[in-house]
Amino acid sequence: MCNSFRIGVLGLQGAISEHVNRLKELEQQPVVVKKSTDLHQLDGLIIPGGESTAIWKLIEENKLYEPIQNFANEGKAIFGTCAGLVLLSKTTIGRDYTPTLKLMDITVQRNGFGRQKDSFEATIQAKYMDDSYHAVFIRAPYIESVGEGVEVIASYNDKIVAARQKNVLVCAFHPELTDDDRFLEMFLTMISSNKNFNHV
């Protein structure tokens, strides 16, 4: 990577260290975000996998809802993986209701591929990638439907598992658990090409 960006990893619960380590390997500057001031001077934000309900409660407790909304409205890039996908969605369906950030016009089926025992790995085809991608699904959700302006990036068994809308990218799997950095590189490209980007 030619450019090194300050990228926040929401550090409330879930796969925090895995994302931090992956970003370091890509010569980026990870910042663990636990309070609103941690968002200052960031070029992008990752909302990692974990337990979406637990992460949401901590977002509220740490008064991060509006700061994350403002971050997105400024045009800064956000990447949500697994639970992060759920939290960024407009609507969720499933047994338990989960409040969300409503930053992407998608409807998500929580734990759509099953619970922990149903975790699996699969080869998928993704837009903008010449070769197949090996994806790790852990209690993975999937996208039931997308609104206008949402670009489908990848599907598995006719279920949408990666998508983008403007400055928000999501995937149902865990890119930080593989050696294939193409989804993270897609996110870094979004940061680099952001018209509002002013690197400090």
From Swiss-Prot:
Active-site residues per Swiss-Prot or TrEMBL entry: 82, 174, 176
Claim: Hydrolase is one of the keywords in the record: yes
Residues given in the record as L-glutamine binding sites: 50-52, 110, 138-139
UniProt-recorded Gene Ontology molecular function terms: glutaminase activity; pyridoxal 5'-phosphate synthase (glutamine hydrolysing) activity
Keyword Hydrolase: yes
Pathway: Cofactor biosynthesis; pyridoxal 5'-phosphate biosynthesis
Catalyzed reactions per annotation: aldehydo-D-ribose 5-phosphate + D-glyceraldehyde 3-phosphate + L-glutamine = pyridoxal 5'-phosphate + L-glutamate + phosphate + 3 H2O + H(+); L-glutamine + H2O = L-glutamate + NH4(+)
GO cellular component: cytosol; glutaminase complex
SUPFAM superfamilies in alphabetical order: Class I glutamine amidotransferase-like (SSF52317)
Swiss-Prot/TrEMBL GO biological process terms: glutamine catabolic process; pyridoxal phosphate biosynthetic process; pyridoxine metabolic process
EC number: 4.3.3.6, 3.5.1.2
Keywords: Glutamine amidotransferase, Hydrolase, Lyase, Pyridoxal phosphate
Function according to Swiss-Prot or TrEMBL: Catalyzes the hydrolysis of glutamine to glutamate and ammonia as part of the biosynthesis of pyridoxal 5'-phosphate. The resulting ammonia molecule is channeled to the active site of PdxS.
HAMAP family tied to this protein: PdxT
Assembly and oligomerization: In the presence of PdxS, forms a dodecamer of heterodimers. Only shows activity in the heterodimer.
Protein family per UniProt: Belongs to the glutaminase PdxT/SNO family.
Name of the protein described by the UniProt record: Pyridoxal 5'-phosphate synthase subunit PdxT
Annotated gene: pdxT
